[in-house]
């Protein structure tokens, strides 16, 4: 009667060996032992002829402790699922739980960082438009084309430092092309619709972004969301609508706006949602291609931004027309915008605050995009969207304060406090895990028996 064993070591390398006569010191690796006979030395006899035992063990160091090495040490645990008996060390469970807690803490930290950058991004964009109020299209193109140079510069230094590897750079580029096309089309559709919709109406319609992300996560990632998560997302979106658009005539504005512009704005957020979920798919797929290694987020930022810039360049005749700039005058417009941005030259009247305020916006926007993509990488597209959504009412509140260059502060919307409470309740409900919801989680982490 031969006994075969497959050993998966949890150290820096994995080894698969056949063990016939020795019993190793096992407390830190996983040994999957297939028994084709009934071992009378075991205190428990099961009539099944095929059993898999999963046992926490230390890598074998060549010393044999004898037959007694099979006896469970204090602190070990065992249980069975069907015909499968599972044995392991309680310390292994502690490490898994600690790892989950560390990841949860990291997600919370990056969610807070993303929300903070989101607030700063919204505030600094409004401040940047003070000196560039005549050149908003220039600022938009600076954000599109200037960031490509910034991201590739960062990527170059990370490659030189060894953080980015050749294997990472060799991943397929077609997904990045699709991301660039989606984001460029989303920008074009959003600009066209925003020109015919009021600000509060756009805020209401922007909440469909979260809906599309949930939809695409279910379709392309196979995710399943619990009732409390769906309800939590709904409350977050409702809270933003109530806190920002209440009392502003948003409903009346939507009734007056044409159906075409409403559908075009919804299409814009659909394309953005698809692009965001596709980035998550890229991160997940890269782990398989890189054999468990994590794809550097600056690769996604760099290639995605480059393809988006190419698509935007092709759409410039259409986009300039949306901004009321004849295409034959676009070159002069961009040149004058650059002079105002630098605040150096003949066109400096009304450019007070440049280049300081626009540069602050550029820095804040880059930080926001990096934090948003980092949060998406370690969590999901939906979580990153929720963190970004929280920044909306906070920014609205900050605009009620006497900020420099903005003049008279705005007043809070009538339903701001009520909407904020709804939003917070939605966030709590989304993150709440009902008791016993993870009871089946253990089954999903038990490795399947190797083929026979």
Curated annotation (Swiss-Prot):
<keyword id="KW-0150">Chloroplast</keyword>
<feature type="transmembrane region" description="Helical">
    <location>
        <begin position="137"/>
        <end position="157"/>
    </location>
</feature>
<feature type="transmembrane region" description="Helical">
    <location>
        <begin position="389"/>
        <end position="409"/>
    </location>
</feature>
<feature type="transmembrane region" description="Helical">
    <location>
        <begin position="230"/>
        <end position="250"/>
    </location>
</feature>
<feature type="transmembrane region" description="Helical">
    <location>
        <begin position="258"/>
        <end position="278"/>
    </location>
</feature>
<feature type="transmembrane region" description="Helical">
    <location>
        <begin position="412"/>
        <end position="432"/>
    </location>
</feature>
<dbReference type="GO" id="GO:0046686">
    <property type="term" value="P:response to cadmium ion"/>
</dbReference>
<feature type="transmembrane region" description="Helical">
    <location>
        <begin position="202"/>
        <end position="222"/>
    </location>
</feature>
<keyword id="KW-0934">Plastid</keyword>
<feature type="transmembrane region" description="Helical">
    <location>
        <begin position="353"/>
        <end position="373"/>
    </location>
</feature>
<keyword id="KW-0472">Membrane</keyword>
<feature type="transmembrane region" description="Helical">
    <location>
        <begin position="175"/>
        <end position="195"/>
    </location>
</feature>
<feature type="transmembrane region" description="Helical">
    <location>
        <begin position="307"/>
        <end position="327"/>
    </location>
</feature>
<dbReference type="GO" id="GO:0031969">
    <property type="term" value="C:chloroplast membrane"/>
</dbReference>
<keyword id="KW-1133">Transmembrane helix</keyword>
<keyword id="KW-0809">Transit peptide</keyword>
<dbReference type="InterPro" id="IPR013936">
    <property type="entry name" value="CRT-like"/>
</dbReference>
<comment type="function">
    <text>Involved in thiol transport from the plastid to the cytosol. Transports probably both glutathione (GSH) and its precursor, gamma-glutamylcysteine (gamma-EC). Exhibits some functional redundancy with CLT1 in maintaining the root GSH pool.</text>
</comment>
<keyword id="KW-0812">Transmembrane</keyword>
<feature type="transit peptide" description="Chloroplast">
    <location>
        <begin position="1"/>
        <end position="34"/>
    </location>
</feature>
<feature type="transmembrane region" description="Helical">
    <location>
        <begin position="105"/>
        <end position="125"/>
    </location>
</feature>
<protein>
    <recommendedName>
        <fullName>Protein CLT3, chloroplastic</fullName>
    </recommendedName>
</protein>
<keyword id="KW-0813">Transport</keyword>
<dbReference type="GO" id="GO:0009536">
    <property type="term" value="C:plastid"/>
</dbReference>
<comment type="similarity">
    <text>Belongs to the CRT-like transporter family.</text>
</comment>
<dbReference type="GO" id="GO:0002229">
    <property type="term" value="P:defense response to oomycetes"/>
</dbReference>
<dbReference type="Pfam" id="PF08627">
    <property type="entry name" value="CRT-like"/>
</dbReference>
<dbReference type="GO" id="GO:0034635">
    <property type="term" value="P:glutathione transport"/>
</dbReference>
């Amino acid at each position: 009667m031969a006994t075969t064993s497959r050993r998966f070591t949890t150290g820096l390398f994995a080894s698969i060996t056949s063990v016939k006569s020795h019993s190793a010191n096992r407390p830190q690796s996983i040994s999957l032992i297939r028994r084709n006979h009934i071992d009378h030395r075991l205190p428990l006899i099961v009539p099944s002829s095929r059993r898999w035992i999963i046992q926490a063990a230390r890598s074998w160091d060549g010393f044999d402790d004898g037959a007694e090495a099979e006896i469970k040490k204090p602190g070990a645990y065992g249980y069975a699922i069907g015909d499968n008996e599972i044995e392991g060390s309680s310390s292994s469970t502690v490490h898994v739980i600690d790892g989950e807690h560390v990841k949860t803490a990291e997600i919370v930290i990056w969610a807070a960082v993303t929300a903070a950058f989101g607030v700063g991004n919204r505030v600094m964009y409004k401040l940047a438009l003070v000196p560039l109020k005549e050149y908003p299209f220039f600022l938009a193109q600076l954000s599109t084309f200037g960031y490509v140079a910034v991201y590739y510069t960062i990527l170059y230094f990370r490659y030189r430092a060894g953080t980015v590897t050749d294997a990472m750079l060799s991943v397929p580029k077609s997904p990045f092309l699709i991301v660039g096309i989606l984001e460029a089309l989303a920008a074009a559709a959003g600009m066209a619709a925003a020109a015919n919709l009021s600000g509060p109406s756009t805020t209401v319609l922007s909440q469909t972004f979260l809906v599309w992300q949930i939809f695409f996560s279910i379709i392309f990632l196979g995710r399943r969301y619990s009732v409390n998560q769906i309800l939590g997302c709904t409350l977050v979106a409702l809270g933003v609508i109530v806190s920002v658009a209440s009392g502003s005539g948003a409903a009346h504005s939507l009734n007056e706006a044409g159906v075409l512009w409403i559908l075009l704005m919804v299409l814009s957020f659909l394309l953005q949602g698809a692009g965001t979920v596709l980035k998550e798919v890229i991160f997940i797929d890269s782990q398989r291609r890189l054999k468990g290694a994590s794809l550097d987020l600056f690769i996604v930022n760099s290639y995605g931004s480059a393809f988006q810039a190419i698509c935007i360049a092709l759409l410039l005749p259409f986009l300039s027309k949306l901004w009321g700039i004849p295409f034959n005058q676009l070159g002069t417009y961009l040149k004058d915008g650059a002079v105002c941005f630098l605040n150096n030259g003949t066109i400096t009247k009304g450019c007070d605050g440049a280049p300081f305020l626009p540069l602050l916006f550029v820095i804040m926007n880059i930080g926001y995009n990096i934090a948003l993509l980092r949060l998406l990488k370690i969590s999901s597209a939906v979580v990153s969207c929720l963190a970004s959504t929280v920044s909306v009412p906070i920014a609205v509140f900050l605009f009620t304060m006497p900020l420099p260059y903005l003049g008279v502060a705005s007043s809070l919307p009538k339903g701001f406090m009520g909407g904020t409470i709804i939003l917070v309740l939605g966030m709590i409900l989304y993150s709440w895990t009902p008791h016993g919801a993870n009871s089946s989680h253990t089954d999903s982490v038990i490795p399947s028996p190797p083929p026979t």
